Amino acid sequence: MFKVKLHKRVIKFLQKLNENDRKRIFSAIEKLEDPFSQPYEKVKGRKDLYKIRVGDYRIIYRVDKEDKIVSVHLVDKRERAYNRL
């Protein structure tokens, strides 16, 4: 199992969401404790970043296999997420 860490801006963004969207995103983030058990995609042009799609939202994260840490760097709507990297 990996430890999941959330960036400050992720926490701030999640606080602004409605409860239904927040639950869906937290559910996806919890699954990152075992990051390679579910389908994942790499972010194009960024060899160290991965993404998960949750409806209109994207979760952008990095996996440190050596230290067993998943760092969630960004959660945002698709149209804004990739511009903020």
Question: Which sequence ranges carry the predicted segments?
Answer:
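Basic, amphipathic "hinge/linker" alpha-helix immediately C-terminal to the N-terminal HTH DNA-binding motif
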Residues: 6-10
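Flexible interhelical turns and helix-capping residues at alpha-helix boundaries
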Residues: 14, 18, 33-36
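A short, surface-exposed loop/turn module that caps and links secondary-structure elements
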Residues: 28-52, 82
